[in-house]
Amino acid sequence: MKKYFAELVGTMVLTLLGCGTAVSLNCGADTASVVGTAVAFGLAVVAMAYTIGGISGCHINPAITLGCLLTKRISGKDAAMYMIFQVIGAIIGAAILFAFTSSDCAFAGGTTTGANSCGNHGIAAGFIAETVLTAIFVLVVLGSTDAKKGAGAFAGLAIGLSLILIHLVGIHYTGTSVNPARSIGAALFEQGQALSDLWVFIVAPFAGAAIAAGIWKAIGEE
């Protein structure tokens, strides 16, 4: 049970700090806001990786959990429980943020929670972006955490840095999710376009995770 609760706490922190930074920076499209938001999400992952990594592996993302399930690093039961607790954690994090913010966030369709949406770029562009970026992110996770070929103690740093890069690329198009839990939590409070576009930020990251698992099986497993 401890590992499930660790996933809840980790996802809550990621959602609160990452989305909270986006809202604090008015979810702007200017360089400073984009970079600041990207760095916040990356640092939140690094912090949690070294805090709860030894307890749960610090997935804090259903897409990562799916990638681990498809590469047989986690059981079906644990994967399901991880995802449930991740979503609960994200909802709690978004609720806390929603409770103390009243910022007007016009970028990517969000207002008070840093929620994701496809904005003016359209569903197709958003779906492609989230699928490709999630595939890259999950591939980094699978490779850097591999028991034999991974980066060992540096895995958390590699994962956090890759998330920064992915946000730098994707924020302009979708606000960058690559994490269904984070998107669900924010969208529930955001409503509007964020809620109507939510399916993209669930289906696309899962598709990307499946692609990443397939790639890793092809290049990383013996």
Predicted features and spans:
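Membrane-interface helix-loop junctions and terminal tails of multi-pass membrane proteins
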Residues: 1-222
